[in-house]
Regions:
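Cytosol/matrix-facing amphipathic helices and coiled-coil assembly/linker segments
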Residues: 4, 50-132
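Helix-coil boundary and interhelical linker segments in multi-pass alpha-helical membrane proteins
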Residues: 15-30, 144-155
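Selected alpha-helical membrane-embedding segments in polytopic membrane proteins
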Residues: 24, 30-55, 99
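Hydrophobic alpha-helical transmembrane segments
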Residues: 27-32, 128-132, 156-161
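Residue-level recognition of pore/gate-forming positions within transmembrane alpha-helices
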Residues: 34, 135, 163-167
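Transmembrane alpha-helical segments of integral membrane proteins
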Residues: 141-142, 157-168
Length: 168
C-alpha cells in the first residue's frame, strides 16, 4: 500500500510542477520533497498505528495472565471449550488444554483465545521502516520517469504510462 501512495502522490506532484515549469532540477526538488515528506508521514502513521496495536495486545496479555493466576480452573475450562469449537472431541480437548496449560499457559491461551503470541508482538519500528521504504520505492518511479526519457516525452505520456504500469 505504501508503494502505491508513493507512486500516486509523487506522480501528481511532479506532473503539477512540470506543468508549470520544464526545469528538471525544480521538478526533482519538488519530487524529492514530496518523497521525503511522504515517507516520513507514512512511517510516523504506521508507527503510531502499530504501537497502539501492540499496547492493546499487551493489555490483553496482562488480563489473560491475571485470569490465569486468579482462576486457573475456569481458564482451563475456557481453553477446553475453545479447542472443542475448533473440532476436538471433549476428552481430547481437555487433555490438549491441560498439556498446553502445563507447558505455557499464557502462550496457549493467548494463541487460541486471542490469536496472538506473547513473544511475537507487533514491532512499530519495523512497521515504520517498512512503510517508509515502500513509499520511497513507489515514489522513485515517477521521479525516474521525469529524468530518464527525452524532454518532450516526460510529461504526460511517459509519466502516466509508468504510473499505470506501476499500479497494475
Amino acid at each position: 500500500m505504501g508503494a502505491n501512495d508513493g507512486i500516486v502522490s509523487t506522480a501528481g506532484l511532479v506532473v503539477g510542477v512540470a506543468a508549470a515549469s520544464t526545469d528538471v532540477p525544480a521538478i526533482l526538488t519538488a519530487g524529492f520533497a514530496g518523497l521525503s515528506a511522504g515517507a516520513v508521514s507514512m512511517a510516523l502513521g504506521e508507527y503510531v498505528s502499530v504501537s497502539a496495536q501492540r499496547d492493546t495486545e499487551r493489555a490483553m496479555l496482562r488480563t489473560e495472565r491475571r485470569e490465569l493466576e486468579q482462576m486457573p480452573e475456569a481458564e482451563l475450562e475456557e481453553l477446553t471449550g475453545l479447542l472443542q469449537r475448533k473440532g476436538l472431541e471433549p476428552d481430547t480437548a481437555r487433555a490438549a488444554a491441560k498439556e498446553l496449560t502445563e507447558r505455557n499457559a499464557l502462550a496457549a491461551h493467548a494463541e487460541v483465545e486471542l490469536g496472538i503470541h506473547p513473544d511475537d508482538l507487533a514491532n512499530p519500528w519495523a512497521a515504520a521502516l517498512s512503510s517508509a521504504v515502500s513509499f520511497t520505492i513507489g515514489a522513485l518511479i515517477p521521479l525516474l520517469v521525469v529524468v530518464l526519457p527525452p524532454e518532450h516525452l516526460r510529461i504526460p505520456p511517459v509519466t502516466f504510462v509508468a504510473v499505470l504500469v506501476a499500479l497494475a
